[in-house]
């Protein structure tokens, strides 16, 4: 088991920040600045991600970068789950999505660059590095 795998196995993390950057370099928050969420990593290498807008009204007034982000805003919620593998050398976590609120995610592989510092987990989308999520590990 690698270092990242050891750190996340059997843990739950709380969302601190979910942000993206538009084409003009402006920071946007696809589900609002106060989005809430959890990410769970099981001991048998499965992941479950749930993120929601605090107000869930779907009206953020932001022009989104992708159809998936538009769908998230409409619903005020994003969730997906499936088995994952970690490339410890490249520091990439890749999830094979089995279930998702966004139908285009089902059957896809979602790759995230991983960085850890203490009880903080930083994930960024490999294909869209402007999308960043910050998580804090929940205490046992």
Residues of each region from the PLM?
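Lipid interaction determinants
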Residues: 1-140
